[in-house]
Amino acid sequence: CLQDVNHPYRQRIDTDFGGRVEVYNKQQLLNGQNFNPTSVNEQLSILVLSYDSFRSTDKEGRKVYQENSNLAQFTKFYNSNGTFIEDVDETALVQVINQMSPLIVVDESHHAQSNLSIEMLNNLNPCFVLDLTATPKKHSNIITYVDSLQLKKENMVKLPVIVYNRPHVSKIGK
């Protein structure tokens, strides 16, 4: 929805940032399509990526860790005191993102709690991480709460939700 300039979310972001917004997917980033130090400096750059984008189990997933001449111009702007990902080329997309210290929004963050997911997130060197989840962990720093009726009114709940109260944990699933 963020790449659709007619979508209300995108229109709001465009309004808030004076139309200086670019939304990128993984392929656009790898190709350096309108993604360079000047554009990143002059606009809000939103990178829409999934955890799968950084999984290195297949050829496509490894591309974010490989040398990439399309992104070589970013290396001139790296902070020599910055945090670098060991054994990853300085022109690799993941290294470029790491050097930007991005603000990261993790949707459905309760699905991203494995050691590998946390390590991958740390490799991106975020300045801030905002976790979005319907099931926060105990002692989470909850910024806002939206009840299910409000979500239903906003058509945010796509499937019927049926909740049963069980008298004891041993009765779950029965």
Model-identified regions with their sequence ranges:
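RecA-like P-loop NTPase motor core of helicase/translocase proteins
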Residues: 1-174
